[in-house]
């Protein structure tokens, strides 16, 4: 699994993810893009879980962003249904590849600037079971996944604190799994009105 953290204020959105990725069949390690921008609208998508599923969601969201009537609110409302519609084919592909059911899981965050509301907005989506609809949860201040290693760590948008939080999470996940499942480099997605930036904070 991966690292996915979100800090939200009225005028700023900060997301951090790790870059550790591995091929589900061969196990070969690589670096993955788990936070991607829709920069013309100051919007980002980030993930913890299946990279292939995330890239499909990003592709559809990016295509939608070209519509003349596009709004963050509309994409936010549609995304849960889109996840549910795509899930059967994804689950089928996982089964046909002979992969364990644990690969059928995704956590996504959609966030960005809302001209309509005059503030930053973010929503979390989770899907684990084809029989149940995607869980959709508005983010009001913060989200940490995994949250266990940060129970005693106060939320902060300061870069050193974001880096330390990611380092703690990667260490916790790797120790819990008995192998490397998180790490690589820590990427930071930063949004404010008129600005959409991704920064590399370094190796964790």
Where are these regions (language model features)?
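Hydrophobic, aromatic-enriched interface-forming segments
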Residues: 101-129
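Conserved short S/T/G-enriched processing/targeting/catalytic segments and their helical context
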Residues: 2-92, 129-204
């Amino acid at each position: 699994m991966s690292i996915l953290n979100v800090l939200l204020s009225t005028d700023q959105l900060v997301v951090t993810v790790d870059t550790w990725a591995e091929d589900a069949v061969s196990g070969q390690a690589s670096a993955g893009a788990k936070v991607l921008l829709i920069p013309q609208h100051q919007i980002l998508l980030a993930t913890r879980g299946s990279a292939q599923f995330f890239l499909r969601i990003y592709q559809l969201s990016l295509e939608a962003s070209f519509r003349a009537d596009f709004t963050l609110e509309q994409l936010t409302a549609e995304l849960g249904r889109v996840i549910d519609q795509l899930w059967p084919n994804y689950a089928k592909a996982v089964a046909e590849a002979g992969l364990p059911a644990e690969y059928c899981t995704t956590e996504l965050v959609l966030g960005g600037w809302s001209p309509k509301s005059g503030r930053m907005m973010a929503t979390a989506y989770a899907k684990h079971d084809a029989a149940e609809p995607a869980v959709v949860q508005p983010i009001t201040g913060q989200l940490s996944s995994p949250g266990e290693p940060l129970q005693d760590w106060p939320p902060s948008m300061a870069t050193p604190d974001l880096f330390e939080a990611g380092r703690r999470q990667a260490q916790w996940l790797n120790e819990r799994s008995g192998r490397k499942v998180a790490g690589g480099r820590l990427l930071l997605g930063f949004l404010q009105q008129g600005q959409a930036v991704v920064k590399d904070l370094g190796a964790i």
